[in-house]
């Protein structure tokens, strides 16, 4: 560890004391209540996503995705690319670690952590693959570099060095140099979480946060 790293090291007491303060001034709204969901969970989730974008939250559509591997939870951040009445969807390689886990246990949860606004939204439910049409529609919207990256990377597999990874990208870049349209790689697509439970969380003073859960068409307020 260099001198600069030692100067900014956080000791155990500092870590224990770290906490943010929450209140109406953080998100500029009143207390989350049942009437916020009069138009359903999807309307509120879209509204909160739009609020995060307007507030300048970095990657407001990022969500922490949890899957199960051999009975053990595994999490990572992914980007929500479809949000509709059917649920939330993301795209990946079907042979990635999460793809293999979902093949065994097709159930997942995802949390949108909008810390800057003192809000979170949580979705959980069964998972299924998105349609071929949805795959092609989203693929056509991806930047060319991201398309090439999907071809170059054997997602979640070990790689010997950064140089090897760069060489793989260079190879597929040459391969598709004369093609205006890059095809969808085999084994690449998307998954959709169909919400069984949706929870909205809003931070408030003294840790007395607001939590409202939508499950089986019922609204419930949960203790923080």
UniProtKB/Swiss-Prot annotation:
Binding site for substrate: 19-22, 81, 138, 142, 207-209
Assigned keywords, A-Z: Flavoprotein, FMN, Oxidoreductase, Pyridoxine biosynthesis
Cofactor: how bound: Appears to bind only one FMN molecule per homodimer.
Pathway listed: Cofactor metabolism; pyridoxal 5'-phosphate salvage; pyridoxal 5'-phosphate from pyridoxine 5'-phosphate: step 1/1
GO terms for MF: FMN binding; oxidoreductase activity, acting on the CH-NH2 group of donors; oxidoreductase activity, acting on the CH-OH group of donors, oxygen as acceptor; protein homodimerization activity
Record: residues binding FMN: 76-81, 91-92, 98, 120, 155-156, 201, 211
UniProt KW Oxidoreductase keyword: yes
Keyword Oxidoreductase annotated: yes
Catalytic activity field: pyridoxine 5'-phosphate + O2 = pyridoxal 5'-phosphate + H2O2
EC numbers on record: 1.4.3.5
Family matches, as Pfam families: PNP_phzG_C (PF10590), PNPOx_N (PF01243)
UniProt-listed GO biological process terms: pyridoxal phosphate biosynthetic process; pyridoxine biosynthetic process
Cofactor(s) required for function per UniProt: FMN
Domain of life of the source: Bacteria
Family to which this protein belongs: Belongs to the pyridoxamine 5'-phosphate oxidase family.
Record's subunit section: Homodimer.
Function: Catalyzes the oxidation of pyridoxine 5'-phosphate (PNP) into pyridoxal 5'-phosphate (PLP). Unlike many PNPOx enzymes, Rv2607 does not recognize pyridoxamine 5'-phosphate (PMP) as a substrate.
Miscellaneous comment text of the record: The electron density for the FMN cofactor is weak in the crystal structure (PDB 2A2J), which does not allow FMN to be definitively placed in the M.tuberculosis PNPOx active site, but the residues known to interact with FMN in the E.coli and human PNPOx enzymes are found to be conserved.
Official protein name in the record: Pyridoxine 5'-phosphate oxidase
